[in-house]
């Protein structure tokens, strides 16, 4: 028997807390499952959202475990498991939106890799410590999967002649999207929006072709983009607008900057029309009415939809490959010990994080 500690909650009225139980590592898994000893787990806004929307009347009384992104070591493997063995270094995104009886901010994570497809093997980079490897690889599954899905889910076959606009170039998703777009899909033009102070970094270090500020008091970001399409792209519109931060200011100009339905243009959002205030989340406010109208309005002449990350192995394998090649480096904002989980949550709620917030579980 071993101690198994997790950061858990019951519903939105109960605070996060560390709960402990004992599990028998020889009996706690099925033939189709593996047991991962978690070394690091990363927090994502969806973790806070799920806690905040766990209303007592619908979420039940069972404890729910915080977290999705993880990295660790396989310590047990069922006899029917294929592709994973004891000692493997693995990372992934654990998906259980409904019950959340298992999560990544815990000592052990039991999963069926034939169902939980967002899992991959990883290798330490040359000169990298064990801790650094676990921290880095806990920090990218969800955001990299989101970026990959934005670029591929509509099967636009984006390439050298394509043009992509990223709203939120400084976000972790925006960074990953740029790296996939340039290094794997070889997309010709990737433009982003960010603060004036981040333009130089996002262009010279990250690699965006052009950036416009969202905090220019003389002209909105949407007006900047409209002028850029007209003057620099000579009227050639974007194939894809990927909203990684929550914005609605581009819709008045949408027909001037993005290709229409008939030309397979797509506006994809992972947030909705506005940036969430994760300290004050209510169910009705979380439902994006304007977004629903845009999505289901039969009279609009552009494609608009929300993007959700599927459980899939392709983006996990791609992310691991790009890290090994040096074409993608996950951004890590800060690292906290397991007992400092509340400080990690506060950092996420601050909206000031520049990269992933990681909790060291071991």
Curated annotation (Swiss-Prot):
InterPro entries: ADH-like_N (IPR013154), GroES-like_sf (IPR011032), NAD(P)-bd_dom_sf (IPR036291), PKS_ER (IPR020843), YIM1/Zinc_Alcohol_DH_Fams (IPR050700). GO terms for cellular component: lipid droplet; mitochondrion. Keywords: Lipid droplet, Mitochondrion. The lineage of its organism: Eukaryota, Fungi, Dikarya, Ascomycota, Saccharomycotina. It comes from Vanderwaltozyma polyspora (strain ATCC 22028 / DSM 70294 / BCRC 21397 / CBS 2163 / NBRC 10782 / NRRL Y-8283 / UCD 57-17). GO terms for molecular function: alcohol dehydrogenase [NAD(P)+] activity. Its main location: other. This is Protein YIM1. The keyword GTP-binding does not apply. It is found in: Lipid droplet; Mitochondrion. Belongs to the YIM1 family. One of its GO terms (biological process) is DNA damage response. It holds the Pfam family ADH_zinc_N_2. Transmembrane segments: none annotated. SUPFAM superfamilies: GroES-like, NAD(P)-binding Rossmann-fold domains. SMART domains: PKS_ER.
């Amino acid at each position: 028997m071993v101690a198994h500690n997790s950061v858990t909650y019951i519903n939105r009225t109960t605070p996060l807390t560390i709960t402990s139980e004992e599990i028998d590592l020889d009996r706690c898994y099925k033939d189709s499952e593996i047991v991962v000893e978690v070394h690091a787990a990363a927090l994502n806004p969806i973790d806070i959202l799920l806690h905040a929307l766990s209303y007592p009347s619908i979420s039940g009384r069972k404890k729910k475990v915080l977290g999705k992104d993880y990295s660790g070591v396989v310590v047990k493997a069922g006899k029917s498991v294929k592709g994973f063995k004891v000692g493997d270094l693995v990372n992934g995104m654990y998906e259980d939106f409904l019950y959340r009886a298992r999560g990544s901010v815990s000592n052990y994570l039991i999963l069926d890799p034939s169902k939980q497809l967002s899992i991959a093997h990883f290798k330490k980079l040359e000169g990298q410590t064990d801790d650094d490897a676990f921290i880095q690889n806990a920090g990218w599954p969800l955001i990299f999967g989101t970026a990959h899905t934005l670029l591929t889910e509509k099967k636009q076959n984006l390439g050298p002649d394509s043009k992509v606009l990223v709203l939120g170039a400084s976000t972790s998703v925006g960074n990953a999207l740029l790296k996939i777009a340039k290094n794997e899909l070889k997309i010709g033009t990737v433009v982003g929006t960010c603060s004036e102070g981040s333009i130089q970094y996002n262009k010279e270090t990250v690699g965006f072709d052009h950036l416009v500020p969202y905090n220019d008091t003389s002209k909105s970001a949407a007006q900047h983009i409209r002028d850029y399409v007209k003057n620099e792209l000579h009227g050639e519109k974007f194939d894809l607008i990927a909203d990684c931060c929550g914005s609605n200011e581009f819709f008045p100009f949408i027909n001037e900057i993005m290709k229409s339905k008939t030309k397979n243009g797509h506006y994809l959002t992972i947030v909705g029309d506005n940036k969430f205030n994760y300290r004050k989340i209510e169910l009705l406010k979380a439902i994006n009415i304007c977004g629903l109208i845009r999505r289901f309005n039969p009279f609009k002449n552009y494609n608009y939809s929300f993007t959700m990350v599927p459980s899939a192995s392709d983006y996990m394998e791609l992310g691991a490959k790009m890290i090994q090649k040096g074409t993608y480096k996950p951004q890590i904002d800060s690292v906290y010990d397991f007992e400092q989980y509340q400080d990690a949550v506060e950092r996420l709620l601050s909206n000031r994080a520049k990269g992933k917030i990681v909790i060291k579980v071991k």
